[in-house]
Amino acid sequence: MIKKILFLLLIPFLGFSQNIDALFSEKGEIYFSFQYDTKNQLNKLSEIISIDHKTNADLAFAYANQKEFTEFLKTEIEYKIIKKEAVIFTNNSKNNWNYYPTYQEYIDIMTAFADSFPSICRLHHLGTLNSGREILIVQISNNVGQKENEPSFLYTSSMHGDELAGYILSLRLIDYILNGYENNQKLTDLVDGIDIWINPLANPDGAYAGGNQDVWSATRYNANWVDLNRNYPDPEDGPHPDGNSYQTETNIFLGLADSVNFSISANMHGGAEVCNYPWDTWSNLTADDNWWQYVSHEYADSCQTNSSNGYFNYLNDGITNGWDWYSVDGGRQDYMNYFRYCREFTLELSDEKTPNPNDLNDLWDANYPSLLNYMEQSLFGIRGIVTDSITGNPLESKIEITSHDVDSSHIYSNLPIGNFHRYIYQGNYDVTFSKNGYYPKTINVSVLNNNITVKDVQLVPLNTTSITDQIYTNIKILNIDILGRESKKGENNIQLIKTKNGRVKKQIKLN
């Protein structure tokens, strides 16, 4: 039986003598709405408060901590506080992923995944917060833990602690993949071909702000009342765009992105139903805007097909450019794309941030084909291995599409394999491979959507001639006649090739 207790109270505060300390006495964040005149005004406000989502052309919703709200008050914009009381669902059964686990249950579930499928699943403890709660991630691959010629793929969810649809969908996705391996061909192909990483809960302090037993008092911000999705280095605004130090959660994921060269990723949120693709921070379109629209529509269209009418059709039929929606500075999506050369978009999975548990099965049915399809995209596009033409050693090479790439849309091949994975909309492209100390190489490549184009490339070192000279200086060639005497003419005689290590090779020379 489901019982829902108390929802939202709208409380107008039209005067500006509000006691700020009292307003934040119970919780370090508030939720409020306000009207705005222009998109430019909304984007300016986004620099001081955390815009959540807007329901129409002139009404916005936002979060703020005490410092942020104090700045907002200086604008003298009228607002309404939305008092979010605990929403409690009582569910007597815990079957088929229709519930929110306690924190300890979450730990146990993640541990059980790795224990039950040790040959294809590994649990990584990325870090521990001051609260003692952990950031966990599972890695899934047919040769888990080994570096292979395959893309690395990342799903994370709930960096906003009260946006929990993706939390359950991620857990269920892990379970579905592990149990389907070698029983379902698509799942088997994904596990065999991709290095899969899934983090269901990126902000456990926010999710379990009310205690480890339930998520009904979850908060958007972390325990320090910082919005983690405004806390990353930004392409336009540089380091610390929110004015805060990098949080422990942020540093954990910065470290993960440094250690694993992810090719594609997605960041799961809630509060709307839409695919949000880059950029968030500025109005520039990415070099691969047509590819982003293609994969975003693929996700949204599949959700619509596998759900009841009205799901996942927000904004542009379920997709939006981030900046066109509202500007975000310090978001993880832009960080991953610009600084880590990884294709990441943001999935807003549910209008309800913490959906009724009875709705979780419907959300799964609508989203799991899309989640798998997006994962499969990491196998497509242009891929190959870059090596040294002399030694055959793998190289970390810059890979750039001529007259196409801009704003850090190029990529690099990854050591220790030298593999690269470049995702791009179908067409013909000139692709340049370059590295210091090597001659650049440009090749023409034809690409089809949802297809693989393999191009292995060898780069020639700039000092090829000197290397050859060094090789031949180790060789001494003598021309001798049939009696063993040295011959100056070098005609119709025997060559004795003597190397410095003392070995002699005999070769008969006939003219």
Tell what function each PLM region has.
Residues K4-L14:
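Sec-dependent N-terminal signal peptides
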Residues K147-H297, D301, T305-N309, M336-L349, ...:
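Active-site/substrate-binding loop(s) of hydrolase catalytic cores
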Residues I382-S389, V457:
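A short, amphipathic beta-strand motif
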Residues I390, Q458-S487:
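Residue-level detector of functionally pivotal "anchor" positions at catalytic/ligand-binding pockets or at interdomain
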Residues N393-L395, I401-Y425:
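Short, acidic Ser/Thr/Gly-rich low-complexity loop/linker segments typical of extracellular
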Residues Q426-G437:
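A short, solvent-exposed beta-strand micro-motif common in secreted/extracellular proteins
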Residues N436-P461:
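Structured interaction patches on ligand/partner-binding surfaces of diverse proteins
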Residues I494-N511:
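C-terminal tail/sorting-segment detector
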